[in-house]
């Protein structure tokens, strides 16, 4: 999941640059063009890691065929060491990592360091966009990591035994403020763990205190389904739960924005 590059054989790695800005959708690509880890492929949140033609929330999940094509043109194989990075302390590398995890890439990790820190550590950088040899990789999808809308509906009805955990801020969770989606509130029955709590001084951390905070919301032996507004900021919460050795975790990629897209979908406030 989250790993310092100091612990990795970076010379044998394949790199994915997932930098992005929700406020400026072109920023990640501009930063990549200015400088990136040598050999890194750029994956864009909107163009590669979402299917914006769909109506299933604000960052809908791409079809498996599209993800397979992304992996193949990126030259990836299932047994590759793949290091994904972004600005550091952001949700975009975890989002990219989750798709790799879902597809069966067992050695994909999220760099704890953002690009500036990677460069400061002396990793080679350049402005060249690589053209990797196309692979014929065949993903091995693990559906136990994915929560469909139907699964979440069954969870709300009490039929799955999974615990919903909302990764948004407490004020959005309670429905007091909603700056993005048209309906304020949360999916009924959800608990709350603000993804910003996963960070310390702008960097993800996984110490004993954080594990205690997570366990105070949901126990490791419970099955957990995480969501946020659009499936982006829930990805680091998913990754951190796995880091904390929670064995049964799912991600509702459509998240709250998908949930409220259905007329008369129930929501809770307070």
Regions found by a protein language model. Give the residues of each.
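Cytosolic catalytic domains that perform sulfur/thiol-centered chemistry
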Residues: 1-270
């Amino acid at each position: 999941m989250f790993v310092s590059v100091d612990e990795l054989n970076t010379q044998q790695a394949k790199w994915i640059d997932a930098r992005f800005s929700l406020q400026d959708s072109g920023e990640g690509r501009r930063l990549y063009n200015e400088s990136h880890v040598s050999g890194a492929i750029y994956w864009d949140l909107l163009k590669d890691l979402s299917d914006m033609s769909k109506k299933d929330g604000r960052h809908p999940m791409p079809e498996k065929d599209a993800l397979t094509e992304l992996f193949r043109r990126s030259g990836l194989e299932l047994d590759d060491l793949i290091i994904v990075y972004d600005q550091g302390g952001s949700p975009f590398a975890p989002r990219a990592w989750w798709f790799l995890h879902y597809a069966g890439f067992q050695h994909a990790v999220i760099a704890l360091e953002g690009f500036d820190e990677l460069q400061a550590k002396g990793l080679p950088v350049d402005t060249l966009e690589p053209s990797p040899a196309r692979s014929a990789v065949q993903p091995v999808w693990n559906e136990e990591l994915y929560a469909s809308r139907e699964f979440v509906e069954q969870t709300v009805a009490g039929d799955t035994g999974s615990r919903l955990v909302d990764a948004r801020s407490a004020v959005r969770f309670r429905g007091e403020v909603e700056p993005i989606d048209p309906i304020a509130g949360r999916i009924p029955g959800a608990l709350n763990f603000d993804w910003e709590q996963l960070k310390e001084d702008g960097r993800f951390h996984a110490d004993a205190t954080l594990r205690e905070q997570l366990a105070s919301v949901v126990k490791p032996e419970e099955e957990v389904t995480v969501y946020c507004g659009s499936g982006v900021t829930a990805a680091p919460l998913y990754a951190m739960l796995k880091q904390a050795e929670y064995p049964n975790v799912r991600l509702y990629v459509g998240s709250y924005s998908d949930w409220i897209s259905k007329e008369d979908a129930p929501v809770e406030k307070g």
